[in-house]
């Protein structure tokens, strides 16, 4: 709490507060200083995993249990207009990871298989922040909702699933076997589930009616409403995290958004840079960058379902 207090006491010294994949509960005093930083005009980027699950947990076996992670942030983010849900998203448009398909006792046979818990998220094509970006690689991501009745806030979805996704409530068993024994794709009937929200306008303090003296601020000193401000909330903690690999006994960081299996680089870095530039009010750079058109992934579901139709047409 002391470090956060010192860092945020002078709003001018912190351009953007990035809350990147925290794994411990926030104390109320920490939340108060973050809240007052925002009420004084401070910009913020939240990358939060509301559910605990990761691939490392699967490295020691074929399955693990994903469960809700209590970071004590729900009331704060709810007050600002966002609710992170304790679910996991599956998407037909997803990453492929090597899976051993050999029977027990036989030589390993690694083949690429879709891992539905690692969606290739779609940036919104209608907002300058996310327009013309490549798909973004996420992993064990959750859904997010715009909430509240604050008429002074504008809420925009800037990242979502493909049209072929579904939400699974936790706790739930996560298994690598789903890659080799996939669920019926008719269950993937929830389109464009939001993953990231941009919130703009005047935020209301989560502490405006609370006793704050024991947390270091007199109640009369609590700023109750912010000036025009911005924040981004993402329901994925690892979206801005570089992946690492061990090679010759050395840990090597991969470029942000790079997938070592497909050798592709996805839009994570560009998405992060755009978030920072947008929060920094660098609209000129945003306008220029949004003119760059990049290739998008083909709709693999439609390709598969309509393959025979187009083969017949072209013969």
Feature locations, PLM:
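Acidic, S/T/G-rich, low-cysteine, solvent-exposed domains in lumenal/extracellular/periplasmic regions
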Residues: 1-284
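A cross-kingdom feature of multi-pass membrane systems that activates on extracytoplasmic/periplasmic
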Residues: 289-299
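C-terminal signal-anchor/stop-transfer transmembrane helix together with its immediate cytosolic
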Residues: 297-315
